[in-house]
Regions:
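Active-site-proximal cap/lid insertion segments
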Residues: 1-176, 189-197
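Short, solvent-exposed polar/charged micro-motifs at secondary-structure junctions
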Residues: 20, 205-209
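Generic recognition of well-ordered alpha-helical segments
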Residues: 156, 178-189, 202, 206
Length: 218
């Protein structure tokens, strides 16, 4: 497994930021050893053990076999080495990042499958494919995981588009866009009138390579 570099502020002391210090998404304090890192042996206790059990029960028998094939060996090593203190905190970070990276890899593979299907079906030139999310996620910055604190890392969201034929724009778009812009974009692209009470702005000018002078800056 890959060894991930830790963010420079992983051991943030939150000096002068009492709200940040009081958050409940610390890798050290709040990352549940059973629920979040999936390390479980019979008889173990944790705050989220029951929630973990409910999730495991949702797996099909085939999925459970595949799940155990991955995590049984990792769990064996974890209990044999028995990390404590700072070593445990950094182990949790690595486990979290490795799981996250594998999820992202699976997403990437399956986005590729969708694009391959659209191309084979002759639909790719007439389809807008959008990959996005509802919020960002902490990847160890400030010693955090999860997303529930309004710092830069969780404010930003991914937005990647595969454009239909006729749109020449490629690469990064530097203008500030928001998720409220998606609905008017889709409506305009489909040739539907955008209701006056929609708050967002269509992204089509940006996707066409234009730079409107009155585009938002904040």
């Amino acid at each position: 497994d890959k060894e991930f570099s830790m963010p420079d502020n992983f051991y943030d002391d939150y000096e002068g930021r009492p709200a940040a210090a009081a958050q409940t998404m610390s890798i050290a304090k709040d990352m549940d050893i059973i629920y979040d890192t999936k390390m479980y042996r019979e008889g173990m206790k944790s705050r989220l053990k029951k929630a973990y059990g409910r999730k495991i029960k949702r797996l099909t028998p085939e999925d459970r076999v595949a799940y155990d094939a991955v995590y049984d060996s990792i769990t064996d090593v974890f209990f044999r080495e028995n990390p404590q203190g700072k070593e445990l905190v950094e182990w949790k970070y690595q486990r979290f990042m490795r799981d996250y990276a594998k999820v992202v890899k699976s997403l990437d593979d399956n986005v590729g499958r969708v694009l391959d299907y659209l191309e084979k079906a002759g639909l790719l030139d007439n389809t807008l494919v959008v990959y996005t999310s509802d919020q960002g996620f902490y990847m160890g910055e400030h010693g955090w995981f999860d997303k529930r604190f309004m710092y830069e890392e969780s404010m930003r969201t991914p937005l990647v588009m595969c454009l239909p034929k006729g749109f020449q724009k490629r690469g990064d778009i530097p203008e500030l866009v928001q998720n409220i812009d998606y609905a008017p974009t889709f409506l305009e692209l489909a040739g539907v009138s955008v209701p006056s009470d929609i708050q967002g702005v269509s992204l089509l000018p940006l996707l066409k390579g234009e730079s409107p002078a009155d585009w938002r800056t904040s």
